[in-house]
Amino acid sequence: XLKGKVXVAXNQYL
């Protein structure tokens, strides 16, 4: 999700 993108690039899929 977008939050994952803000937190960590690896979590952008979340």
UniProtKB/Swiss-Prot annotation:
Q: What else is known?
A: On the 2D-gel the determined pI of this unknown protein is: 6.5, its MW is: 28.2 kDa.
Q: What is this protein called?
A: Unknown protein from spot 6109 of 2D-PAGE of heart tissue
